[in-house]
């Protein structure tokens, strides 16, 4: 009788909390994917996280390693590792694509695009088959082009396909701002728009602030320019130091974005999204500030950019468009609806 009473009270408590089991799939159990799964679990973003990889045993091993920290860290999320069996990712609320290969010596941009597009195509076909209602978060590089390809391949509405890059770039921008100001990094605001790449991103220094005070009134112009340059080569700086691409901040960025979706937090986050006239850009996927909630992209925010900033965005869009056009030339969009 006592057990039955406790059970019923538990059900009532869960109902009062509007409890809803959530499932997130992370494709790619490399450094970025595994870190994302780990942070998602620690922050209890979802009830279940599925980590999937093509390499035999890799995802299982990473998932087991994460789960063996559960009692130490204190999380209840279940992390499962899977080798290439997408049926176990079925009914995911959010799917994250981190899989892809880095550019190798002697590899052309077109070759890298072709290789990663094939990987993304295979992944997307499996994910959409088993989780047709999911929101897609793309991290694979070149990120803007892979997000654009994912949107075209799935045929999903644009609010359900999101590229993660701008969030990571903005986090790096705020780091360099806080270092220059000598202040708490949580008190700094900064945003990066444009393409995800050291030549295409646009750290918006004019909008940067410390506790609401414009950074332009706190730092000399040359120092701000130094911060902008450091931000733009932030990824390359880490690659040089680490000998490989960064993974901790990218993994945490994924968790931050997914949490805003799953928990309907309506956070303002710069992401790569498909534009249909916003900022004077059409039929292109590029980074702009958006509100992220349960439906994915809830709203695209129109910033009051000046002439110089708009020109930089157009220049960035041109570079991003070249990648997207290359995918068309390579025949990748011929797969759509086939």
Each PLM stretch: what is its role?
Residues 33-34:
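N-terminal Rossmann-fold NAD(P) dinucleotide-binding loop
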Residues 71-134:
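Rossmann-like NAD(P)-binding element
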């Amino acid at each position: 009788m006592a057990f039955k009473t406790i059970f019923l009270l538990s059900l009532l408590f869960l109902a009062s909390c509007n409890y809803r089991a959530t499932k997130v799939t992370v494709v790619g159990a490399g450094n970025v994917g595994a870190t994302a799964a780990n942070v998602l679990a620690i922050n209890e973003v979802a009830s279940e996280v599925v980590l999937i990889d093509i390499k035999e045993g890799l995802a299982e091993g990473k998932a087991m390693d994460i789960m063996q920290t559960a009692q130490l860290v204190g999380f209840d999320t279940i992390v499962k590792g899977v080798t290439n069996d997408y049926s176990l990712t079925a009914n995911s609320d959010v799917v994250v694509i981190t899989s892809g290969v880095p550019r190798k010596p002697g590899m052309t941009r077109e070759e890298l695009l072709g290789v990663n597009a094939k990987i993304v195509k295979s992944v997307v076909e499996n994910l959409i088959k088993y989780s047709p209602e999911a929101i897609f978060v793309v991290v694979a590089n070149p990120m803007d082009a892979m997000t654009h390809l994912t949107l075209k391949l799935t045929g999903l509405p644009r609010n359900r396909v999101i590229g993660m890059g701008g969030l990571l770039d903005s986090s790096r921008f705020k780091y360099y701002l806080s270092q220059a100001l000598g202040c708490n990094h949580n008190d700094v605001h900064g945003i990066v728009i444009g393409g995800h790449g050291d030549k295409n991103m646009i750290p918006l220094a004019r909008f940067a602030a410390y506790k609401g005070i414009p950074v332009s009134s706190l730092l000399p112009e040359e120092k701000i320019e130094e911060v902008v340059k450091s931000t733009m080569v932030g990824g390359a700086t880490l690659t040089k130091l680490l000998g490989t691409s960064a993974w901790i901040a990218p993994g945490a960025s994924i968790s931050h974005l997914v949490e805003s979706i799953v928990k309907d937090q309506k956070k303002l986050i710069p992401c790569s999204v498909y534009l249909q006239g916003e900022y004077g850009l059409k039929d292109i996927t590029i980074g702009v500030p958006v509100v992220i909630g349960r439906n994915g992209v809830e709203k695209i925010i129109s910033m009051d950019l000046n002439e110089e900033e708009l020109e930089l965005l157009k220049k960035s869009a041109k570079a991003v468009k070249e990648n997207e056009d290359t995918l068309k030339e390579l025949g990748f969009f011929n797969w759509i609806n086939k």
